[in-house]
Each structure stands twice: as structure tokens, then as C-alpha cells.
Amino acid sequence: MARRDQLNGKGPLVGNLRSHSMIATKRKFNVNLQKITIANSNGTPTTLRVSAKTIKTLKRKGILSAQA
């Protein structure tokens, strides 16, 4: 399964790991994925893998309850 946010599609970023001598080697910054359960429009629960930032945004907008 790909490490990708199922709501907004945010995926891993690629950057450099810098040693003390400033030699650059490639590294990957993974997304902080969490599992949440949201009820559909018909009431059935659905499990999604979303990033922690998406959960924070959903709580701030009032879409997700504060307990999740």
C-alpha cells in the first residue's frame, strides 16, 4: 500500500540527508499517516489513512469530532 493520504493525496517528499561534512545523500520524508474512521452519508463506517495534518484540519473545520 502506498504511503499516501487518501483524502488529499499528499505523499512522501524527497530531500537530502546532510552529514557533518555536508555530503548529500538522498532520503525520503514520509507522511505521518494515521487511521481514522468516518461515517458515510448512509451511516456505515469507513476507515481512511490520512495524514496528521489532515486530521488537524478536519477537526478545525468541524468535520471530524474532537475525540478522533
Curated annotation (Swiss-Prot):
<keyword id="KW-0687">Ribonucleoprotein</keyword>
<dbReference type="Pfam" id="PF00830">
    <property type="entry name" value="Ribosomal_L28"/>
</dbReference>
<dbReference type="InterPro" id="IPR026569">
    <property type="entry name" value="Ribosomal_bL28"/>
</dbReference>
<dbReference type="GO" id="GO:1990904">
    <property type="term" value="C:ribonucleoprotein complex"/>
</dbReference>
<dbReference type="InterPro" id="IPR034704">
    <property type="entry name" value="Ribosomal_bL28/bL31-like_sf"/>
</dbReference>
<dbReference type="InterPro" id="IPR037147">
    <property type="entry name" value="Ribosomal_bL28_sf"/>
</dbReference>
<protein>
    <recommendedName>
        <fullName>Large ribosomal subunit protein bL28</fullName>
    </recommendedName>
</protein>
<dbReference type="InterPro" id="IPR050096">
    <property type="entry name" value="Bacterial_rp_bL28"/>
</dbReference>
<dbReference type="GO" id="GO:0006412">
    <property type="term" value="P:translation"/>
</dbReference>
<comment type="similarity">
    <text>Belongs to the bacterial ribosomal protein bL28 family.</text>
</comment>
<dbReference type="GO" id="GO:0005840">
    <property type="term" value="C:ribosome"/>
</dbReference>
<dbReference type="InterPro" id="IPR001383">
    <property type="entry name" value="Ribosomal_bL28_bact-type"/>
</dbReference>
<keyword id="KW-0689">Ribosomal protein</keyword>
<dbReference type="GO" id="GO:0003735">
    <property type="term" value="F:structural constituent of ribosome"/>
</dbReference>
